């Protein structure tokens, strides 16, 4: 008889009921965001390819903001530098909470999505680089490294309604880790001229913000100015301003201190802030950025062919569709192979393949990195946008085919996960 301590770890095992309910709420918000993102993308593409495309370009180029603070930015810059800072703030809160108080505080559960995210970043970057060694577009190597969680979950909402919660959680965590890795890449690889003085000065409001939230201060009139000042100084330093969103998120405590009653007294400020800011991120920040970045003049089938003949666009398509699938699937398999773990009962490796394909739905962060690599509005950036859109649609269709084949098995698992024959609070399983 096996010692309980030596029982094999199961990949994608069900988490706690409380964590399952929390994740379900997040997934609902992200699915709504995905619908808005798709609508914004269609609107932008339609406008950019209409006889009134000039008005779209004029709108994006409109400057506003305090010039004295060097913040007289265009609408497109505000969307990329300002609104996406909110998106990364929420992503940072979610990631910190998962690893401090969620099911992923258990290293045996955290290793799979973290390793899969790393593989899903490394392999696309390598494939893109190999295709662009001599094309002059090597600077865009990071474009196919990101997964768009809102877009991916909107696909799941249509084709995988009964997908086991553990698989949804895996995809969510993978995408969040993916986004945080992208922020590190942006900070390191896409920072131009670095101004040390504003960067050092940003430490002051960041430290004040940290001190206040650690003391459980919620007053927006204190915290918001400090957050905005931190963002403005990071922006002035030359580091991409979205980095400020992650730094602020990591400063927020997840658990209550002992002086505030300890973890048993209720959630910390991270969950409070997440509830406040996630709707703004999901319903405003991501869709508006998509509207500002996805509007590219395609020019019919001929224009589509010309765009995809650019090695940069081709590298993006191969990186997202092929590289993501190989990186996520292979890394997950290797973790299972070298740890002796096995899949949860009822699941098969084809399920992991479906999620790996869905990881190739890259949009928001891929478009952002494309703009940073080649400059917004440049011909190559437009080609990259076409590549991102083509790859995302292709990956979504391939994932749909794979996941549809398993819907009957998912329905059986869903029935077991949600059965409540004893009519108590929560399923029997």
UniProtKB/Swiss-Prot annotation:
NCBIfam families: NhaA
HAMAP family: NhaA (MF_01844)
Membrane topology, from the record: Multi-pass membrane protein
UniProt keyword annotations, A-Z: Antiport, Cell membrane, Ion transport, Membrane, Sodium, Sodium transport, Transmembrane, Transmembrane helix, Transport
UniProt xrefs under InterPro entries: Na/H_antiporter_dom_sf (IPR023171), NhaA (IPR004670)
Coiled-coil stretches noted in the UniProt entry, renumbered to this chain: none
Function, as annotated: Na(+)/H(+) antiporter that extrudes sodium in exchange for external protons.
UniProt name for this protein: Na(+)/H(+) antiporter NhaA 1
Single annotated GO MF: sodium:proton antiporter activity
Transmembrane segments: 32-52, 73-93, 111-131, 140-160, 170-190, 193-213, 219-239, 243-263, 284-304, 316-336, 349-369, 383-403
PANTHER family the record matches: NA(+)_H(+) ANTIPORTER NHAA, SODIUM ION/PROTON ANTIPORTER NHAA-RELATED
One annotated Gene Ontology cellular component of this protein: plasma membrane
Pfam families attached to this UniProt entry: Na_H_antiport_1
Gene3D superfamilies xref list: Na+/H+ antiporter like domain
GO-annotated biological processes: regulation of pH
Reaction catalysed by this enzyme: Na(+)(in) + 2 H(+)(out) = Na(+)(out) + 2 H(+)(in)
Main location: membrane
Family membership noted in the UniProt record: Belongs to the NhaA Na(+)/H(+) (TC 2.A.33) antiporter family.
Compartments in which it is found: Cell membrane
């Amino acid at each position: 008889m096996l010692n309980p301590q030596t029982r094999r770890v199961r990949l994608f095992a069900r988490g706690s009921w409380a964590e399952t309910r929390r994740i379900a709420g997040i997934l609902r918000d992200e699915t709504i965001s995905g619908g808005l993102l798709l609508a914004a993308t269609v609107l932008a593409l339609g406008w950019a390819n209409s006889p009134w495309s000039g008005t779209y370009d004029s709108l994006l180029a409109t400057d506003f903001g305090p010039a004295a603070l060097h913040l007289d930015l265009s609408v497109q810059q505000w969307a990329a530098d300002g609104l996406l800072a909110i998106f990364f703030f929420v992503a940072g809160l979610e990631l910190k909470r998962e690893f401090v108080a969620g099911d992923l505080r258990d290293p045996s559960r955290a290793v799979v999505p973290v390793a899969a995210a790393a593989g899903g970043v490394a392999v696309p970057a390598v494939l893109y680089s190999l295709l662009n060694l001599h094309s002059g577009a090597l600077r865009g190597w990071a474009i196919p490294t990101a997964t768009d969680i809102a877009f991916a979950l909107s696909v799941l909402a249509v084709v995988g309604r009964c997908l086991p919660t553990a698989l949804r959680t895996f995809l969510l965590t993978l995408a969040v880790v993916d986004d945080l890795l992208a922020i590190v890449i942006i900070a390191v690889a896409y920072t131009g001229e670095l101004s040390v003085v504003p960067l050092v000065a940003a430490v002051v409001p960041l430290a004040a913000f940290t001190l206040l939230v650690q003391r459980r201060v919620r007053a927006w009139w204190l915290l918001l100015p400090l957050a905005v000042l931190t963002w403005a100084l990071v922006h002035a330093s030359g580091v991409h301003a979205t980095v400020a969103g992650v730094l602020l998120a990591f400063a927020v405590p997840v658990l209550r201190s002992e002086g505030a009653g300890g973890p048993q007294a209720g959630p910390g400020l991270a969950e409070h802030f997440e509830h406040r800011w996630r709707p703004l991120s999901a319903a405003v920040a991501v869709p508006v950025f998509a509207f500002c970045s996805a509007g590219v003049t395609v020019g019919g089938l001929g224009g589509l062919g010309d765009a995809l003949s650019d090695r940069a666009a081709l590298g993006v398509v191969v990186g997202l569709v092929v590289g993501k699938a190989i990186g996520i699937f292979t890394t997950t398999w290797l973790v299972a192979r070298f740890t002796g773990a096995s899949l949860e009962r009822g699941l098969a490796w084809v399920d992991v393949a479906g999620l790996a394909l869905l990881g190739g739905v890259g949009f928001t962060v891929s478009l952002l990195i494309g703009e940073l690599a080649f400059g917004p509005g440049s011909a190559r950036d437009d080609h990259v946008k076409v590549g991102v859109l083509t790859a995302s649609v292709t990956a979504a269709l391939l994932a749909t085919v794979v996941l549809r084949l398993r819907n009957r098995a998912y329905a059986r698992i869903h029935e077991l996960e949600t059965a409540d024959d004893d009519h108590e609070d929560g399923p029997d399983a």
